Amino acid sequence: EGPRTFMGFSVSDYPNMFMVIGPGSVGVLANYPPHIEMQVAWIADFLEYLSANGNTRAEVDADAQDQWCAEVEAAAVGTMFNAPNCHSWYNGGNIEGKSRVIPIYMGGLDRFMARARDLAANDYEGFSIH
């Protein structure tokens, strides 16, 4: 099936696990320092939100994760990385039998950051919070 995350931050069925520069983030297509800083700040803000609201557990919903993965795939349409004759680690085509999945969000860091801000502004919709 390939790597599946929600914005490279979180994975369904793994509550309270957060990461930076994971699959589904802008990753290697962005300047790492601002991308890492943005993701660390987002995760820290989310943890503060959880604590301020008396919550101790957060897990991304599988539906939200699936929607994000579809958005990652859609952002790659028309790029060389998604071309049928591209056999690269970018899409899993370098290993026969491996799932062809684009693990990098190609919509750009600005759009990625705007999406993350919107998520926070909407009380982290897409996460089950307890």
Regions found by a protein language model. Give the residues of each.
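Central helical "cap/lid" subdomain
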Residues: 1-8
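C-terminal, flexible cofactor-proximal segment of oxidoreductases
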Residues: 5, 18-130
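Short glycine-/polar-rich loops that comprise or flank the Walker A/P-loop
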Residues: 14-16
